[in-house]
Regions:
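A short, conserved, highly charged catalytic patch centered on acidic carboxylates
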Residues: 8-123, 130-156
Length: 156
């Protein structure tokens, strides 16, 4: 059952106990947040590793994290790969994933910046499982800065 997993890239993220299952010749991976098995794609592989990284290594409460979030803002429907909410359920961090084979470009960030004009999250993260970029938005000074690391939850 590991044949597909072995073909999946090794990521620049800590390993965790991955739960997968095979069904009708397709492989599925357990999404801990949605509590169900999801088709295993390269993006999903990155997403599940990243969520475990945030929860197990950076202290993010899983109760405030959500995957595949559809938000309607001003009549526009937005799909975010993952969202970290504040305790009063406002988006604090938006996370977008790419397959490990996809290089993260300015275009990737333009997409997440466009989302954020509607969402007003404080942090924007993009990861392809190999490189992770975290951008902190300063609304007061209308600027942003890239952080050298993904912050711990308590430091947000």
């Amino acid at each position: 059952s590991d044949c597909k997993i072995n073909k999946m890239n090794r990521l620049n993220l800590p390993p965790y106990e991955i739960k997968t299952r095979q069904q009708d010749g397709r492989q599925y991976i357990l999404d801990v947040l949605r509590r169900k098995f999801i088709a295993l794609t390269p993006e999903e592989w990155v997403r599940q590793h990243f969520i475990h990284f945030l929860a197990d290594h950076k202290g993010y409460p899983t109760a405030l994290l959500a995957n595949e979030v559809e938000l309607t803002i001003g009549g526009k429907k937005l799909r975010c790969d993952s969202v970290l909410y504040s305790r009063d359920l406002k988006p604090r961090m938006i996370i977008e994933y790419k397959a490990p084979s996809i290089a993260i470009s300015q275009k990737t960030f333009n997409q997440i910046f466009a989302y954020n004009t509607l969402l007003h999250a404080d942090y924007l993260v993009v990861s392809n499982g190999i490189s992770h970029y975290c951008c902190k938005i300063d609304y007061t000074n209308r600027s942003y800065s890239f952080l050298s690391d993904i912050p711990r939850y308590e430091d947000l």
